[in-house]
UniProtKB/Swiss-Prot annotation:
It is a multi-pass membrane protein. Disulfide bonds: none annotated. InterPro entries: MetI-like (IPR000515), MetI-like_sf (IPR035906), Phosphate_PstC (IPR011864), Phosphate_Transport_Permease (IPR051124). This is Probable ABC transporter permease protein YqgH. One of its GO terms (molecular function) is phosphate transmembrane transporter activity. Belongs to the binding-protein-dependent transport system permease family. CysTW subfamily. GO terms for biological process: phosphate ion transmembrane transport. PROSITE patterns: ABC_TM1. It is found in: Cell membrane. GO terms for cellular component: plasma membrane.
Length: 309
């Protein structure tokens, strides 16, 4: 009888333990599913809200979409208001592309140095620096650019201050450099050792191995890092606003002042009446930013699919 009771007790404990594990699994699934649904709902709600607000200037206020995207005139407070945002679209693309042209070579070169040239101590030295740069707030970058970079650039201009497209480009290139470097370093470190060993076995030097074997193998991921950096640069507002000048005209040179979509939105949104034409056109500019973010995401997914192939 005692053995039977002990066997029943053991079996009951096993059943109870199994039921508890099943309950824990169900709870875990429910929590994860709820979090995923909240994220999806928030993303959909933001997209719908921004889409509805962004389209009101065209559907309700009668602003021409063609004029909005192609006109060079932005003067919403004039007696004959103009709502052309082409200078700001150009400024956003210009500062993004130029900053990527500066940060991409430096970031990829830094990643190669960390993983291939000095793998033992390079990462120990550079990784904390990269993490420090990532953690610095945008306003600090902007303040340093305003107090150091802008006066320096002003020395090379015949008139005016040093606020310019060049200042915004340099500040943004420093801001996106950690993103490009860290992702590129992970890409280089994830390459199989057989690539390096096979190249060395064929008599290639370290530089030949890096240039002709490793970089081509990691190229899709390296481009993903660059695109992620560009996506951050395109959406940055505060740091750029402090140094770029925020003018309404197309810049003719890197030393000219400029404006971007994000800087104009942050400068003007608080000074407009909710629901007014100017307010709705600012929401339309936000919709343009959202569309560009989707395009960056699609480009990243395309590059990621190439990497898997």
């Amino acid at each position: 009888m005692i053995n039977n009771r002990e066997n029943m007790s053991v079996s009951e404990r096993l059943i109870s333990s199994r039921q508890n594990r099943q309950l824990d699994e169900v709870r875990g699934r429910m929590i994860v599913t709820a979090c995923a649904l909240i994220m999806i709902a928030a993303s959909v709600a933001i997209t719908i809200f921004l889409g509805v607000k962004g389209l009101q200037s065209f559907l309700v206020n009668g602003v021409s979409p063609i004029e909005f995207l192609t006109s060079l005139n932005w003067n919403p407070t004039d007696s004959d208001p103009k709502y052309g945002v082409l200078p700001f679209i150009f400024g956003s693309f210009a500062v993004t592309i130029l900053s990527a042209l500066i940060a991409a070579p430096l970031g990829i070169a830094g990643a190669i140095f960390m993983t291939e040239i000095a793998p033992n101590w390079g990462k120990k030295v550079l990784q904390p620096v990269i993490e420090l740069l990532v953690g610095i707030p945008s306003v600090v970058y902007g303040f340093i650019g305003l107090t150091v970079l802008v006066p320096f650039i002003a020395q090379f201009k015949s008139s005016g201050t040093g606020h310019s497209l060049l200042a915004g480009t340099i500040v943004l290139s420093v801001m996106i450099l950690p993103t490009i470097t860290s992702i590129s370093a992970d890409a280089m470190a994830s390459l199989p050792k057989s690539l390096r060993e096979g190249s060395y076995a064929l008599g290639a030097t370290r530089w030949q191995t890096i240039r002709k074997v490793l970089v081509p193998a990691a190229f899709p991921t390296l481009m993903t890092a660059v695109v992620l950096g560009m996506a951050r640069a395109f959406g940055e507002a505060l740091a750029v606003q402090m140094v770029i000048g925020n003018t309404r005209v197309l810049p003719e040179s890197p030393f000219d002042t400029a404006g971007t979509l994000t800087t104009i939105i942050t400068l003007n949104m608080g000074h407009t009446t909710y629901g007014s034409v100017e307010n709705n056109t600012l929401w339309s500019m936000g919709l343009v930013l959202l569309v560009m973010s989707f395009l960056f995401i699609l480009l990243i997914r395309y590059l990621s699919s190439r990497r898997k192939v």
